[in-house]
């Protein structure tokens, strides 16, 4: 509001205007009106100044609220994205995929097919046939018993086989006679007057390696299976496992030596508790064997304490552990993890470069499998360069799309992903140049699955020697399984002292 006065006059001018022609009272009234107008102008100016200040304050407050609103929107978007994070688009374990209406372990990167559940047409079945059972009987490894139904006659019969297991405790009496010197040559394993045989000990070690039962439950299970005849205790089971671990030292060294000479080995680590603190168990494996180690940390120094890493000169396949880049001569990255991150980026930003790169990596892997089936060891130079150019084009498109990504957190994470894909391009595409390098590190994931199960089911470790014992036992058992060797027979051989199995 602005008040305008066309004429401002002084007292002398007022007198001149009066010129004696106006009454004094009229003049006084006119002066009062002018005074009131002056007062109104001052009051109006003050109100205008106050309103201007108020408007200025409101603008500042509006800007502040706008910033807060933008931050809340960013936080809301980030939290929504976090709710959608699971094992299919991050490195979170499947066991954490708990969402309303859906069970855990129900998420992966596989796409649904139209196939029905169960056996597929053209696949070989695994039904145990009558002919296979008769072959087993002929081998002499099975006790053959005959049971009849109906009256025995010459009219003929049909045969049905029932395969069962009979658990019968055996007490073997060992008689040790004096030698020529009049002494009893008692072997070390028979120092105690009563000992458990290799079969009982092998069963206990095998159950312990599974990691789903505590020692007292293993003892209870074997006691129940023997109808109470064994009378095992928790301490007995621990003693069997400790003895097996001690006897496995030579075999572990052979496994380590074999892995050191391999061109490509896979490794990963998972968290376990040790005396209430966070610790790790790491695997080192190839297609034929695996060795486990306990670690306090995942640092470069902790890795250096494992003799394998300081002597290995091949290619390490891992899940982007930067500390591992200090060891070995070459490195391959797990691309399944990258596929998850690319899926997450597509969901959160809506940008297409990550979807295109994901499709490209899967295409390369499919074509690689076909080439391997045809006996080839690598792509042609022309094909390899084509794939590398397409990879680079996806990253260039990603950089352009990142400029227009709206949400701050998604934009920052996308930029980080693009930087990683560019910096470690050779490591992510090593499987493209060398077919002996796997596309993913799923082998290590499977190797550590038992360790994770043990942590959840039986708990962690109270002492470091307990962790070391478990790692040694698991190394032997999992290697035997991977080589499809008779598990119980070879565990018993180690107990007996003839462990030449590797």
Q: What annotation goes with each model-predicted range?
A:
Residues 1-192, 238, 267:
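Short, flexible loop/hinge motifs at secondary-structure junctions
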Residues 2-23, 27, 31, 42, ...:
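Catalytic center-proximal scaffold of phosphoryl-transfer enzymes
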């Amino acid at each position: 509001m602005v008040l305008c006065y066309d004429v401002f006059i002084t007292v002398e001018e007022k007198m001149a205007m009066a010129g004696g022609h106006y009454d004094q009272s009229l003049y006084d009234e006119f002066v009062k009106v002018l005074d009131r107008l002056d007062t109104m102008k001052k009051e109006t100016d003050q109100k205008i100044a106050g309103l201007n200040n108020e408007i200025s304050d409101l603008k500042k407050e509006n800007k502040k609220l706008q910033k807060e609103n933008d931050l809340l929107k960013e936080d809301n978007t980030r939290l929504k994205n976090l709710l959608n994070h699971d094992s299919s688009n991050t490195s979170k374990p499947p066991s954490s995929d708990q969402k309303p209406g859906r069970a855990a372990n129900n998420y992966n990167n596989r796409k649904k097919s139209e196939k029905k559940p169960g056996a597929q047409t053209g696949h070989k079945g695994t039904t145990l046939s009558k002919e296979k059972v008769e072959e087993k009987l002929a081998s002499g490894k099975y006790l053959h018993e005959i049971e009849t139904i109906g009256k025995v006659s010459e009219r003929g019969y049909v045969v049905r086989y029932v395969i069962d297991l009979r658990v019968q405790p055996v007490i073997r009496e060992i008689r040790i006679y004096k030698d020529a010197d009049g002494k009893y040559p008692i072997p070390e394993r028979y120092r105690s007057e009563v000992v458990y045989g290799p079969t009982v000990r092998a069963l206990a070690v095998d159950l312990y390696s599974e990691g789903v039962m505590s020692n007292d439950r293993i003892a209870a299970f074997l006691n129940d299976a023997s109808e109470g005849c064994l009378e095992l205790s928790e301490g007995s089971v621990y003693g069997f496992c400790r003895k097996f671990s001690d006897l496995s030292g030579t075999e572990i060294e052979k496994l380590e030596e074999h892995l050191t000479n391999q061109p490509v080995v896979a490794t990963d680590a998972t968290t376990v508790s040790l005396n209430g603190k966070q610790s790790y168990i790491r695997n080192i494996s190839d297609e034929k064997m695996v060795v486990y180690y306990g670690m306090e940390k995942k640092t470069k120094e902790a890795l250096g304490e494992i003799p394998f890493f300081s002597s290995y000169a091949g290619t390490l396949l891992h899940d982007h552990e930067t500390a591992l880049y200090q060891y070995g001569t070459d490195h391959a990255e797990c691309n399944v993890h990258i596929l998850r991150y690319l899926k997450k980026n597509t969901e959160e930003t809506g940008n297409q470069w990550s979807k295109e790169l994901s499709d490209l990596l899967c295409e390369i892997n499919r074509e690689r499998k076909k080439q391997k089936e045809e006996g080839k060891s690598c792509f042609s130079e022309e094909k390899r360069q084509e794939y590398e150019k397409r990879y680079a084009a996806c990253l260039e498109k990603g950089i352009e799309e990142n400029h227009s990504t709206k949400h701050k957190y998604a934009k920052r994470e996308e930029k980080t992903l693009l930087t990683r894909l560019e910096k470690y391009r050779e490591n992510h595409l090593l499987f493209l140049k060398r077919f002996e390098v796997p596309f993913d590190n799923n082998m290590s994931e499977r190797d550590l699955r038992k360790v994770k199960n043990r942590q959840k089911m039986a708990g962690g470790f109270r002492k470091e020697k307990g962790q070391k014992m478990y790692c040694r036992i698991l190394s032997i058992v999992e290697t035997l399984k991977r080589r499809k060797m008779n598990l119980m027979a070879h565990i018993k051989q180690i107990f007996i002292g003839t462990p030449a199995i590797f």
